[in-house]
């Protein structure tokens, strides 16, 4: 009997639905790629320069096993068209399948795919080997966003898939009774992933607990982290009302090796701002504050409030920052879209441990993000960092910064 293993990611996503940094969401569930390296587990420049696997200019190689497939000439990421997928009235999914004429070696890679959807949903890239064992890569795609490349992370394994001999590729979007909207896909690629897993530690919103709770834990291991500030909420004095960092505390975090990045001016949902606010001012004003206050290097990096984005916020993130973080899944590969780097938000202790174990086992890049810490989440952070220390000491993981990611792991 085949084993079915959810390597922490599924549990982490379930928890993320209750996180302080992401809206509650419900998920529907059912059951030549070899690379050269520089010798340290880091893909070489040549290895990361991958040609597209499929540009969807010719759809004959694909079969819509569930739902309908058609070319969309009015919407494309590359070339003259994309593939449009639509589910039928009684379908619980759309499923596009490509059977390969010969097994393909996709070991050590992660998929990237340009995706747009009318309804917010997880999208799945599933690889199946000759024995029928499979691995699911996923990413959350938001409604109202343009057709852009998404970096997919590892979600689950069924059996023991041999990724050096992939026979089928499935593109899947689960649907419900009230979310039968179209999905567009284009430009399927496979990017190399570092053999030695890379981990980023992040804190959203610029809460004072970054300084009072997180910093002492990370200092014990000499680990860097990133504090993404809602800059208009930073206090000038400890006596000022609020639960966000004081300006001097931000400086001490930076002096301790932390990256000070942006979570926008107010840390509000950029897809649903109140009157008088817009993504352009929320993002550009926060960057200006960071630059004016001596945090120029961190001003290059951004995390989307509540992990939500649309076309306007994507455009402004790209215009103002080198990297931006959103998503739900761990162990991505080289960032094919540097403004949608994946992350796992507010995991519980067990989920954080599983995500770290997954990254140690499979490599790739995982960002663990927390919001304001309370007693429970502080305990989770402490346990996760302790386990991270064990895996790092064993040579199985490495803690990196956004600058490291930008320098070495962007396509």
Feature names for model-found ranges:
Residues 40, 156-165, 170-203, 207-210, ...:
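C-terminal active-site subregion of NodB/CE4 polysaccharide deacetylases
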Residues 32-68:
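Extracellular carbohydrate-recognition regions
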Residues 4-20:
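N-terminal export signals
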Residues 72-92:
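Short carbohydrate-recognition loop motifs
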Residues 197-199, 219-311, 320-322, 334-340, ...:
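Metal-dependent polysaccharide deacetylase catalytic core of the NodB/CE4 family, i.e.
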Residues 87-95, 103-154:
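Extracellular ligand-binding interfaces
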Residues 19-28, 34-35:
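Bacterial lipoprotein signal-peptidase II cleavage site
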